[in-house]
Amino acid sequence: MDNKKTNKSELTLQFHAKAMLSDYVTAVTWSPDGTTLAVCSAAGEVMLAAVAAVNELSLQTLQTATGKSADCLSFSRDSQFLAAGGQDGKVRIWRVNSGELIADLDNQRVWVDKLAWSPNCNQLAFSMGRYVQVWNAEDNVVEVTLNFDSSSILDLAWHPMVQYLAVSGYQGVKVWHGEDWDEDPEILSVPSATGAIAWSPQGEYLGCGNMDNTLIVNEWGNFEPWVMQGFPGKVRELAWSDKTNSLGAPLLAAASSEGISVWEKHADESIGWDSWGLEVHEKVVNAIAFQPSTFLLASAAADGQVCLWYEAEQLLQILEGAEGGFSCLAWHPEGQFLAAGGCGGELLVWSQSMGGKDFGLSKLL
């Protein structure tokens, strides 16, 4: 790993603000420009929050509780649009600065639990059973419907640099080329099913968390993937660091049951990847994410703890505030705020400490 380490006291967080939604927080995400936090709930609420310099959250309601879960959120690359999908089978898109609903795409009552904006253009991909549709914001039309065929879609992820769309499900991952949607997708086969998928920040690796308790890392353009085994259950969550080690490779964190493993590329190709475990959580880890530009890893679990791991190795701090457990988390794009959602409707935000003082709802290790 890179020897240039950040001072620990600069990485600790202090309680910043809290708000409450009426039910389980299903997703939380920041706009790419860092000005807005979006959150949604199992009651169907969709809200925007401006994080003020003072300790408060200013919530703007885009959608009130409907009784049907809102499950996924994504901001467009220019931060102008927010998309949400959920149990009612609709994909709704709002203009962020005005809160205006600009599109309401009916998905024929198929639960929409995965959606993502392209980081390269104003295209929105979303799941609809065994299919993925790609909606073009410029023309307000569904550009293409892709047939995964072998099962319902379990995850989808755009390549960060080029117009590739990876889609996972039974028997692996299919990668479509957005320059020509009619071209047959590339297929990355697994004997079981692939759930969570994640491209590394530069797009050279695709991580695949599988239902047979394995993790596969594909180096794009190399047809010999690395297979990691020994997980206690299915690999539920993946997170790449945008900081790289001395080999120029990012770290990959993988959550399975109550444990987290961190994988680092080894200089010896025959070894492939080294790993180590992070074990503090007592219940299922629901979300993991690296702070931008560092190896500081945050993990949120059903045990009511958000843990911060220094250099993705050493427990640095435990954040609390959701007694029924944490369901999701997201770092601000510049890393100075961490937002997390709770199973009881809590929305908590922590901010970087000034000299490591005033920690609010936290424990220092």
For the regions a language model picked out, list residue spans one by one.
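Short coil/turn segments within WD40 beta-propeller repeats
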Residues: 43-47, 88-92, 110, 130-133, ...
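Short loop/turn segments that connect beta-strands within beta-propeller blades
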Residues: 51-54, 96-99, 137-140, 178-181, ...
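A short beta-strand motif characteristic of beta-propeller blades
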Residues: 14-18, 57-63, 100-105, 141-146, ...
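A short helix->beta-strand "capping" segment at the edge of beta-propeller domains
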Residues: 2-23, 57
